[in-house]
Curated annotation (Swiss-Prot):
The lineage of its organism: Bacteria, Pseudomonadati, Pseudomonadota, Betaproteobacteria, Burkholderiales. It comes from Burkholderia pseudomallei (strain 668). Its EC number is 2.7.8.7. InterPro entries: 4-PPantetheinyl_Trfase_dom, 4-PPantetheinyl_Trfase_dom_sf, ACPS, Ppantetheine-prot_Trfase_dom. It is found in: Cytoplasm. Transfers the 4'-phosphopantetheine moiety from coenzyme A to a Ser of acyl-carrier-protein. Transmembrane segments: none annotated. GO terms for molecular function: holo-[acyl-carrier-protein] synthase activity; magnesium ion binding. Keywords: Cytoplasm, Fatty acid biosynthesis, Fatty acid metabolism, Lipid biosynthesis, Lipid metabolism, Magnesium, Metal-binding, Transferase. This is Holo-[acyl-carrier-protein] synthase. Its cofactor is Mg(2+). Pfam families: ACPS. GO terms for biological process: fatty acid biosynthetic process. It comes from the Bacteria.
Length: 143
């Protein structure tokens, strides 16, 4: 396996909060997958700030992932097709669905993700890995 791509994103929590307020909550429904949306609602019910921070980290994760795979937010990369969830240990991981999952599987691409947030910002770092020949083809190196 080799590095296929690296992506990072920094989201301003207050900006995410403003968009959420302006859209009456529709922003969360547009961006979050079903499992993420359940966690968002549960966290927001306990603490508005923690709910918004969760939304900011997940928005940031999708942006960083889209950069790591080199597509940006273009088909098959869609907001709801990628979810960042947490293992019982707290470790974040990504799970793709639909056409994005098929696209990743066809290329043997996997990813590692880390997310962090403070009061003002959420940051994500993603490393996408693929078989050596796939990663080399993307980088333009001779196979």
């Amino acid at each position: 396996m080799a590095i296929y791509g690296i992506g990072t994103d920094l989201a301003q929590v207050s900006r995410i909060a403003a968009v959420l307020e302006r859209t009456g909550g529709r922003f969360a429904e547009k961006v979050l997958g079903p499992d993420e949306l359940r966690v968002f609602h549960a966290r927001r019910a306990r603490s508005e700030a923690r709910g918004i921070a969760f939304l900011a980290t997940r928005f940031s994760a999708k942006e960083a992932f889209s950069k790591a795979i080199g597509l940006g937010m273009h088909w098959p990369m869609t907001w709801r097709a990628l979810q960042t969830l947490n293992r019982p240990s707290g470790e974040p991981y990504v799970i793709a669905s639909g056409e994005l999952a098929a696209w990743l599987d066809a290329r043997g691409i996997t990813a590692r993700v880390t997310v962090s947030d403070e009061r003002d910002y959420a940051v994500t770092f993603v490393v996408a890995e693929a078989p050596d020949d796939v990663a080399a083809a993307r980088s333009g190196a001779a196979s």
